[in-house]
Each structure stands twice: as C-alpha cells, then as structure tokens.
C-alpha cells in the first residue's frame, strides 16, 4: 500500500472501497449494485415556471381563512406558540405582553419588510428593552464579531418570514443582506411575524418560487434555506429528546390578518 494511502487509512480509518465491500458482504452481495442515475438538470423555462406561478397565485387566493387555520394547526403540532390577529394594533399589544412576561431585556431583530408594517422598534423602546437591528454588518454599524455576540446574548430574536408552509408548519427564511440565521438561532426565544401573503401550502410551492428567483436573478438563489419547524430538538442514541440545544427552546408565531 502506498505511503499516502497508508497515512489516509490511519487518519480516516477503513478506506471507502473496503468499507463498502464489507457492507456488501454483510448483505450477501458479491458485486456492487448499479449506481443510481444522476439527477437531471431542471429543464423548466422561465415561461413554464411563470405559468406555474400564476396557477399557484390563483390557488392561494382561494380558501384564505381555511389555509391560515390549517397553518395554525400544523404549526402548533410542531410546538410553535401560534397567535393570529386581525390587525397590527392587536398584534403589537400581544407582543408587548409577551416580551413583558418573558422578562426580555435584550432583543435583536432582522431587517425585513414586515417591520415597516409593525412598530417593533417603538415598542422595544417603550418597554426599555435594549435592541439591535442586525443590518449592514461590517458597514460601519456592527462588526461581524459584535453582531454575533449581540445575537448570542439576546433574550429574544425577532424576524419576519419569507414563506410559511402549511404542510410542515415551518417558517422559511432566505439569506439576504440585513438578515443573519443567528437572529433566529442564537437567542433562547424566537418570535416570527408572518404576513398572509407569505403563506403557501407545500414545500413544492417554496421550491417553485425559489426556482423562479434563480432564473430571474441570474442564477443566484443564495447559499441556504432556513426552515424553522418549532423549537430546536436533538436526541441521543437512547432517543432522549432535548429541546433548545442547537437553537431556541421556545418559538412564537404571530400571524397578521
């Protein structure tokens, strides 16, 4: 065995081919099975996707209240604390009571369009809660290190949503300037504010809209999608479930409309 291969074996353990051969032997197979065919490139044109988008919009316009009620049910099933309000005033009053009940002293929020509708900054100021907007990191306001520490030290992270999926009860957040995943992951409590127009039925709806963005924006669809389906959960080999290890242990969803 060449020296380089010996060193890699020592560092990484059993070589891949030997490991797979051992697995095949345990399964009673003498030769490798045929590999799965490669995934084909998505072939839909922009015109095709725009037609699908129009069909999606027409579907989402129907049964509006029923869809929101279904979202409330599915989100609660994944341990979201969900509340729906007919107007901004009632939503703001609820958020004020929530922040007071939680004893929040430090908050961080993202910079998303929803905060042009709901006066979160004014509310935080009225409650004497220290707050930071995680925006323009490294552009003269907050360095990456400062922003990260503020998000870790905060009692609550407040975000909007880009999509909210009825099928899974998930809030979906896209990467963008002015928004860090740590706003929803770092603090022990996450509050997501959802507008009705962000609610879709299925994950397929999300991926359709993402493919459209990909074609419309010159092939840039961002580096990740952040799906938030209730509080952080993890379990060990004995299936002991622990909440809040790798993210917030408490999540709240406020639906406007």
What are these regions (language model features)?
Residues 1-257:
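The feature marks the mature, well-folded catalytic cores of soluble enzymes
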